[in-house]
């Protein structure tokens, strides 16, 4: 393989730049030319492709976001979009692609491989909700950023004796809420993977204050449950009488310089993706399990260890959907000093 390309797709995540850098530098060391594709699959279809060299990536390791930029491009799910993208790849003599992103990005990588262009997926998302890996690129940084913000909210909550509902990202998974909640000493953590009773939430807040055990109260809420304002309103409807505030950390969690762990993880995965493409291997996703790199087929059966399967009507389904660690939810309950 003489020429490969790299793109970032879906939501940005700290560490994506580190992965791109690793792909470029590893490929150059193997005598392979590298091209960057701007704005993910949209840029592929539109031919927004350019040559990358060591100088272009020399100062991106510590930068958040993705210097290749990203975009959601549902049109690539259709055959017409795929063929247009492949036509552009052929113009540049590109023979393989590294795709950094989430589940939707993996689906695109799978389609490219089916059309004869080996593609390797790297898990890039702050939500940590991609199957086939223990941790995703960007998760560690997102947790660190959320924890820092929650520490500051703890300060003001204590100063005024207030209750805070703090919303963090996590549309389908509660990993950020659980990890940042435990790290910041949250009193309650509400995640999509676990049912909750709003009356119990309010009872714990009330009894914490009345017993004198609590002078303030922090509830960390994953966005996949509902928004902080709506949750706070439900608390009031259920009889909460505390001085209640709602806040949303929002996109702040996505930004910022990646942690050392995210940089190392992204670099390790990016270099390995080049090794796979050099061998002509595509249709796989790289992950980490028990601190070792692993590879999983993107499409196949659950028995084969594949991440996704196709139903008889052609619908893509996840074989083993990601679930946040609910033992961490139990851990937090044991530490919150609430009955």
UniProtKB/Swiss-Prot annotation:
The active site is at 127 (proton acceptor). One of its GO terms (molecular function) is AMP binding. The keyword Transport does not apply. Pathway: Carbohydrate degradation; glycolysis; D-glyceraldehyde 3-phosphate and glycerone phosphate from D-glucose: step 3/4. GO terms for biological process: canonical glycolysis; fructose 1,6-bisphosphate metabolic process; fructose 6-phosphate metabolic process. ADP binds at residues 185-187, 214-216. Its EC number is 2.7.1.11. Substrate binds at residues 125-127, 162, 169-171, 223, 245, 251-254. It holds the Pfam family PFK. It catalyses: beta-D-fructose 6-phosphate + ATP = beta-D-fructose 1,6-bisphosphate + ADP + H(+). Allosterically activated by ADP and other diphosphonucleosides, and allosterically inhibited by phosphoenolpyruvate. Mg(2+) binds at residue 103. It comes from the Bacteria. The keyword Manganese does not apply. Its cofactor is Mg(2+). Signal peptide: none annotated. NCBIfam families: PFKA_ATP, PRK03202.1. Belongs to the phosphofructokinase type A (PFKA) family. ATP-dependent PFK group I subfamily. Prokaryotic clade 'B1' sub-subfamily. Homotetramer. This is ATP-dependent 6-phosphofructokinase. It comes from Streptococcus thermophilus (strain ATCC BAA-491 / LMD-9).
